[in-house]
Amino acid sequence: MAKATVVKKHNGGTIAQNKRARHDYFIEEKFEAGMSLLGWEVKSLRAGRMSLTESYVIFKNGEAFLFGAQIQPLLSASTHIVPEATRTRKLLLSRRELEKLMGAVNQKGYSCVPLACYWKGHLVKLEIALVKGKQLHDKRATEKERDWQRDKARIFHK
């Protein structure tokens, strides 16, 4: 009789979120991208040691790169190398998605930022979004709308 295989599950699936991006930008369209990582980075992601604040996506030579994201190294996982926490990481997107994103980012007012990093099976995926910046009055209107939705739910719940 065959031995039962133990499936290792990751807690939650979400590694990191960029809540600041949802506050500062209007999200036009979302994309899912793979990331090219080193071994010590994957071990650090399993421990949940990633920060997406102040990170963004840049395009060079027809390729997309994640710039400014921090993956803090584990002391036990990176003993033989000197890890760089904020290195630029290549994003894996299809040609059609790359062309669509590059065309939109070249327009005035659009940029591309990461929203979340999560596990999809044994792979690390990054949710990136095509965004447009918010003005201060837009942020206030969004906050007022969120408060009204919360109050409305509280009233109807009674």
Curated annotation (Swiss-Prot):
Single Gene Ontology MF annotation: RNA binding
One GO cellular component term: cytosol
Main location per the UniProt record: cytoplasm
Keywords, comma-separated and alphabetical: Cytoplasm, RNA-binding
Record InterPro entries: SmpB, SsrA-bd_prot, SsrA-bd_prot_CS
Keyword Zinc assigned: no
GO biological process: trans-translation
Organism superkingdom: Bacteria
Protein's cellular compartments: Cytoplasm
PANTHER family: SSRA-BINDING PROTEIN, TMRNA-BINDING COMPONENT OF TRANS-TRANSLATION TAGGING COMPLEX
Functional note: Required for rescue of stalled ribosomes mediated by trans-translation. Binds to transfer-messenger RNA (tmRNA), required for stable association of tmRNA with ribosomes. tmRNA and SmpB together mimic tRNA shape, replacing the anticodon stem-loop with SmpB. tmRNA is encoded by the ssrA gene; the 2 termini fold to resemble tRNA(Ala) and it encodes a 'tag peptide', a short internal open reading frame. During trans-translation Ala-aminoacylated tmRNA acts like a tRNA, entering the A-site of stalled ribosomes, displacing the stalled mRNA.
Recorded family membership: Belongs to the SmpB family.
Protein name as it appears in the record: SsrA-binding protein
